[in-house]
């Protein structure tokens, strides 16, 4: 028989659990600061075509840029309310740790060391990549295993530098790294002939070849990938609410693609769709925004600004973009890829 005291305690716990399940999120310090200043401060690459790059008028574009725009739209209702902070590889983590930026969306690889020791949380993967090599097409090298004793240009302070050393040792290649602090210096040295190869993420190789080579056909990207490079945005530790918001905006973009919600049809789907999942994503049946401390239309605003994940990929990096990259593993889980989002519910 349950005592009166135990009944009271049990009843209180059940009530607390029910309240926790339905209560709105309390705004964290990052969200409060963003709303007060009216901008999301986003750390991006200094210039990587397809991911984050400014034109001559200071207009930013790219996959990483669109992720920040979607977050700003979800949080503030306007994807243009973003302050861009260009950062090199050495600056990016200290800028996040110090509070200079709210989010780092800068082709950064999710690793154990970074996750556990740099005071940051990765919020998901927005591009599954792998490290490769670029060499002159007129040379004899057609495989990374043929780089024995070669000089290879690489940027310091990156997983790329460490992977190069590991690959060389594992295959007894005796590769000679030529290390540069700035990526522009590394690529410039390669195109000037100071190195026999250049290495970075495969997406970065395509970007550099497209943007910097006088004739892109003069350079080939070797077929091997020597590492896994899951790239995605990250936030500071210590603000669970902000971490949850950024994570679920990314998931929402992936979920929107899976259910056919696009930049062009999002408002029509909101008005007429009877699909329970679509209705939850767009806030017509459930106010999921309340759980995040956001407006009911948080995902409507995000999708209206950038489109879904597939649209973001195709526009910036896909086969019809200047980079011309295949969707590959970055396709949805039900289309041969590994992009997968937990349900928005």
Where are the model-predicted features located?
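Bilobed "Venus flytrap"/periplasmic-binding protein-like clamshell domains
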Residues: 41-50, 60-75, 109, 129-185, ...
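Bacterial N-terminal signal peptides that target proteins for export
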Residues: 2-12
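Sec-exported extracytoplasmic/periplasmic mature domains
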Residues: 35-39, 72-77, 97-101, 109, ...
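Extracytoplasmic small-molecule ligand-binding "clamshell" domains
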Residues: 27-105, 284, 288, 292-299, ...
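Extended ligand-binding regions for polar small-molecule ligands
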Residues: 66-69, 73-75, 138-141, 145, ...
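Short helix-initiation/N-cap motifs at beta->coil->alpha
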Residues: 82-94, 177-192
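Acidic, polar ligand-binding/catalytic clefts
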Residues: 69, 73, 77, 81-146, ...
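N-terminal signal peptide c-region/cleavage motif recognized by signal peptidases
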Residues: 22-23
């Amino acid at each position: 028989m349950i005592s009166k005291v135990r009944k009271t305690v049990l009843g209180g716990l059940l009530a607390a659990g029910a309240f926790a399940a339905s209560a709105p999120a309390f705004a964290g310090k990052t969200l409060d600061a963003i709303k007060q200043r009216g901008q999301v401060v986003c750390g991006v690459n200094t210039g990587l075509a397809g991911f984050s790059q400014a034109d001559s008028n200071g207009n930013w574009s790219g996959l990483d840029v669109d992720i920040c725009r979607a977050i700003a739209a979800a949080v503030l209702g306007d994807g243009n309310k973003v302050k861009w902070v260009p950062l090199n590889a050495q600056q990016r983590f200290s800028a996040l740790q110090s509070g200079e930026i709210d989010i780092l969306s800068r082709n950064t690889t999710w690793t154990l060391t970074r996750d556990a020791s740099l005071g940051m949380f990765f919020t998901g993967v927005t591009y599954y990549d792998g490290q490769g090599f670029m060499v002159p097409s007129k040379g004899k090298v057609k495989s990374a295993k043929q780089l024995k004793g070669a000089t290879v240009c690489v940027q310091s302070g990156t997983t790329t530098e460490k992977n190069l050393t590991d690959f060389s040792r594992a295959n007894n290649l005796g590769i000679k790294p030529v290390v540069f602090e700035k990526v522009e210096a590394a690529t410039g040295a390669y195109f000037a002939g100071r190195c026999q190869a250049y290495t970075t993420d495969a997406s970065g190789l395509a970007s550099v070849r497209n943007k910097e080579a006088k004739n892109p056909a003069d350079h080939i990207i070797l077929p091997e990938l020597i590492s896994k490079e899951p790239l995605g945005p990250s936030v500071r530790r210590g603000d669970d609410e902000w971490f949850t918001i950024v994570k679920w905006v990314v998931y929402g973009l992936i979920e929107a693609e899976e259910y056919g919600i696009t930049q062009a049809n999002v408002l029509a789907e909101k008005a007429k769709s009877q699909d329970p999942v679509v209705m939850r994503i767009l806030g017509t049946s459930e106010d999921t925004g309340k759980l995040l401390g956001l407006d009911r239309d948080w995902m409507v605003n995000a999708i209206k600004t950038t489109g879904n994940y597939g649209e973001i990929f195709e526009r910036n990096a896909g086969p019809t973009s200047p980079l011309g990259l295949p969707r590959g593993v970055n396709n949805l889980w039900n289309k041969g890829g590994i992009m997968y989002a937990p349900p928005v519910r």
